A protein has these predicted regions:
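Composition-driven, intrinsically disordered low-complexity tracts enriched in small residues
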Residues: 1-207, 289-315, 830-831
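Acidic, turn/loop-rich segments in luminal/extracellular domains of secretory-pathway
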Residues: 245-324
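Active-site region of glycoside hydrolase catalytic domains
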Residues: 330-365, 370, 451-742, 753-831
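Aromatic- and Gly/Pro-rich amphipathic surface segment
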Residues: 359-401
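Extracellular ectodomain surface segments
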Residues: 195-242, 316
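Low-complexity, Pro/Thr/Ser/Gly/Ala-rich linker/spacer regions in secreted
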Residues: 200-209, 321-332, 831
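Intrinsically disordered, low-complexity domain-flanking/linker segments in eukaryotic proteins
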Residues: 292-301, 424-440, 487-495
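Aromatic-lined substrate-binding rim segments of carbohydrate-active enzymes
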Residues: 392-477, 571-582, 594-596
Length: 831
């Protein structure tokens, strides 16, 4: 966090709001900053060169000042309570819990309103109604289920409606082009010309001898390459141009209405020189309805016609290659306060010889299940892991001294802290908030040995100059929250399941208690918190768990209709945890940051059409990007909780108390995803899955061992989309599965070069975290996928770390210089 962060919070917090609304910390803080917050147009537009990224959103206060207090005038605040929690009982903290009116629909319903305006509207609603509003109502998935895991006829009806809509849209799509342009001459020859133009229209085609590209410097000193896409239409039809994704190697490009383009390379390529490519879709559809010969008639055959004749003769894909000549004087540094880090999670890395096992988690039970092991649905057990539970001291030393890091992201295992249920701790008497007496009751239930262990880990990190980032929940759940072997048959059959994880309506509240407890216990050591890790990713692996096709994660069922319930409950849990952490972590652990800087980590996969001319592929990519990359930030930043999973902003889906519950957005990127479209969503409950991803061959130099394409352009794309939410970003995971360490060095240099370029052009990115520090248990895939900068030697008692020299040299070369060294660019940037 920046030095300016606390000053900004202090300057912008309205003391009147803090005094009048004592228990609504973050909402009151935001209410005091709405009028003075800079508008979106005042923010550096990181997506100015990317026409398909939303308008930059209004930035919000990333920290959140502590404005809590007791309504009877005593010092019973969370801050005061935390100071005495370990030594003497203190009166419970009083809390005035208020509800918030819905966001004004005049702003929400407008397609032109930015997300920042919607967020500001939500914040104003908080301030205006805090004293008089009724109780907060959390979002609820509309259904006809008698219990959360029952089958729901509504899902089937919604699916049928979607199928019909998809087919009807496909039938009428050709006619949306509008009436054809009239012939210039109404005489007989004009009529014949019209017939030819309408039924034998020419497809846009590349120019035989396009103009050469030109490199120049702008008045701001930016390197740009200009040229023309080089496509013509023999009929003189108007052409439109759409850039697909981002340039492959991290640059930006815009294309004008006449096909002229302006390409800007990322700073590293501008300094060294090299090549980049980008893809443009060119179409003559705007000229009106016409047919491109006999095959063009296939456009009137819904869905199948697009499969047989992609584009229908209207659209072509054009790939442009640009060459950049080096320019001297390009700044390749990072800000002094930039966070460089590595990461691992508890379940994945703690286990190993000499480490105590944690049999109380759902994942431990899942990977030890004899049936799962017999069927090959799991690939490893934590007992064979790298033993981070006992090697944390030496790992911290390596991260600091050999890798040059200043941050280490870890997870604290819920099942280690609370192996038994905390349901008996009732927080309903405080209207759903956690009080000091609740925390003391939780403390009596906690495993104090594990509490002390994690404090020792945090102490070791700080002793080695590493700032901790703590993930509150990194997928795993205690068995009393989720017993996958009991839940699997019950959920699959639609029967009530007592411990169904995030499908249970009680899980968000239990998670709130856990988050509050961690903040209370470790707030003096931790400022940076991630509530949940990759909340959308398990939707596929848990509820479309097709054996040997999709990785099977607990509970491993075929119940896609439950996806929305899973997501909504996680969103509710995140919001509750966000408020709880801000309430109980009021101690600044690092000199320059806020007491609590809270976000969530979000896996983002940019989908691209496998063939941009194929409308079905485009639809599949668009649906994926909207749901997978946007659902969760829409819910907890904008307050739009798409409870019915239809992608439509309905009046009842905006919840002001859910909005602006992020101080930073953690971005996790590994690679991109080409999509082959179906034209319909074949799986009921999964409207985002309108096609299937195309994997690459691991033999390719730009393909990971996970068979996923790796391209810096995809990294830029997701970072620009994430930045459009107006929150600071933190890259909380970026890495590649590469067992022989031949692809990882280039991956690191080129992806970090994208980060440097974005930061230099104004994007607020606080840090970069590589996943992972050491090879670990990659969930159902076992130990086959190796992401680590180190391996571990199981033949040594201390599980000695085995370095991967090329990757360590590349990453430490960047972190220790806080810049992109020339020698690394020469070695790894594409020619």
């Amino acid at each position: 966090a920046d030095d300016a962060l606390d000053d900004e919070v202090a300057d912008e917090t309205d003391p009147d709001v803090a005094e009048d609304v004592p228990a609504v910390d973050d909402e009151a803080d935001d209410a005091g900053t709405v009028e003075e917050a800079p508008l979106a147009e005042d923010v550096t537009d990181v997506g100015a060169d990317a026409p398909d990224v939303e308008e930059a959103r209004e930035p919000d206060d990333p920290g959140g000042a502590d404005v809590s207090g007791d309504i009877d005038g005593t010092d019973d605040s969370p801050a005061a309570a935390r100071r005495t929690a370990q030594t003497a009982p203190v009166d419970e903290v009083s809390a005035a819990v208020t509800d918030i009116d819905p966001v004004p629909m005049s702003l929400i319903e407008s397609d032109t309103a930015t997300a920042g305006q919607r967020s500001a509207a939500a914040t104003v609603a908080v301030a205006d109604t805090a004293a008089t509003a009724p109780a907060v109502v959390d979002p609820e998935v509309p259904s006809w289920r008698p219990w959360p895991t029952a089958f729901d006829l509504r899902t089937g009806l919604t699916y049928v409606k979607d199928l019909i809509t998809s087919v009807v849209d496909a039938v009428f799509r050709p006619f949306t082009a509008g009436a054809p342009a009239p012939s210039a001459d109404p005489a007989a020859w004009g009529l014949l010309a019209w017939v030819r133009r309408e039924f034998f229209n020419s497809t846009p085609s590349p120019v035989a001898n396009p103009l050469p590209h030109t490199q120049s410097l702008t008045v701001d000193g930016e390197v740009v390459v200009t040229g023309n896409v080089g496509v013509e239409d023999a009929d003189g039809d108007e052409l439109t141009y759409t850039v697909i994704g981002r340039p492959l190697n991290g640059g930006t490009v815009t294309v004008a209405a006449d096909g002229g383009f302006v390409y800007r390379p990322m700073n590293a390529m501008a300094a060294l020189g090299g090549t980049d490519t980008f893809t443009v879709l060119v179409s003559d559809e705007h000229a009106g309805l016409h047919v491109h010969g006999l095959f063009g008639l296939l456009k009137f055959v819904p869905i199948v016609g697009e499969l047989l004749y992609p584009g229908g003769g209207d659209r072509i894909e054009r790939t442009i290659t640009v060459t950049v000549e080096p320019v001297a004087g390009i700044d390749l540094t990072f800000p002094d306060e930039f966070h460089w880090g590595v990461a691992h999670s508890g379940f994945q890395a703690e286990g190993g010889p000499g480490s105590p096992v944690d049999p109380a988690s759902d994942w431990y039970r899942w990977v030890h299940d004899p049936l799962n092991r017999l069927l090959g649905l799991v690939g490893g057990v934590p007992e064979n892991g790298p033993g981070a539970y006992v090697s944390y001291e030496s790992d911290a030393a390596l991260a600091r001294d050999e890798l040059g890091m200043n941050t280490f992201r870890i997870g604290i295992e819920w099942s280690r802290i609370f192996p038994d249920s905390t349901a008996a701790v009732d927080i309903s008497d405080e209207d759903g908030t956690v009080s000091l007496s609740d925390l003391q009751a939780l403390d009596a239930l906690a495993d104090q040995g594990e509490v002390a262990h994690y404090r020792a880990v945090l102490d070791a990190l700080r002793a080695h100059g590493l700032e901790p980032m703590v993930t509150v929940n990194h997928f795993t759940l205690p068995l009393w929250v989720h017993d996958p072997l009991v839940a699997r048959p019950l959920i699959q059959l639609g029967l009530p399941a007592p411990a169904a994880g995030w499908l249970s309506s009680t899980t968000p509240q239990e998670f709130e208690k856990y988050a509050a407890y961690l903040a209370w216990k470790y707030g003096d050591q931790v400022d940076n918190w991630a509530t949940v890790n990759e909340p959308f990713s398990p939707v596929l692996t848990e509820f479309l768990a097709i054996p040997w096709v999709v990785p099977n994660w607990p509970p491993g069922v075929l119940r896609p209709d439950l996806a929305s319930t899973f997501l909504v409950n996680q969103a509710i849990g995140h919001v509750a945890a966000y408020d709880a952490i801000h309430a109980w972590d009021t101690t600044v652990a690092a000199a320059d940051g806020p007491a609590a800087f809270v976000g969530f980590t979000h896996n983002m996969i940019p989908a691209r059409p496998a063939n941009a001319a194929n409308r079905l592929d485009v639809q599949a990519a668009d649906a994926w990007n909207h749901f997978y990359n946007g659902w969760f930030p829409n819910a907890v930043i904008d307050g739009w909780v798409d409870v019915d999973f239809d992608g439509v902003r309905d009046d009842g889906e905006f919840f002001a108390h859910m909005a602006d519950k992020v101080d930073f957005l953690g971005v996790q990127y590994y690679g991109s995803q080409p999509m082959f479209g179906f034209g319909v969503a074949p799986v009921p409950g999964f409207p985002f899955l309108r096609g299937f991803p195309i994997r690459c061959s691991a033999d390719s130099p730009t393909c990971s061992d996970f068979d996923q394409p790796t391209d810096p352009g995809g990294f830029r794309e997701v970072l620009e989309v994430a930045a459009s939410y107006g929150k600071p970003l933190w890259i909380t995971e970026n890495g590649i599965a590469d067992d022989d360490d031949t692809k990882r060095p280039s991956y690191l240099v080129n992806h970090i070069a994208v980060v440097q370029d974005l930061v230099a052009h104004g994007t607020d990115i606080r840090g970069y975290t590589y996943w992972s520090f050491v090879d670990n248990l990659e969930w159902a895939d076992g130990y086959d996928l190796q992401f680590g900068l180190y391996g571990s030697d199981p033949q040594t008692p201390e599980l000695e770390r085995t370095p991967k020299p090329a990757s360590i040299a590349a990453l430490s070369g960047i972190t220790t210089s806080n810049a992109l060294p020339w020698w690394l660019l020469e070695q790894y940037l594409p020619d």
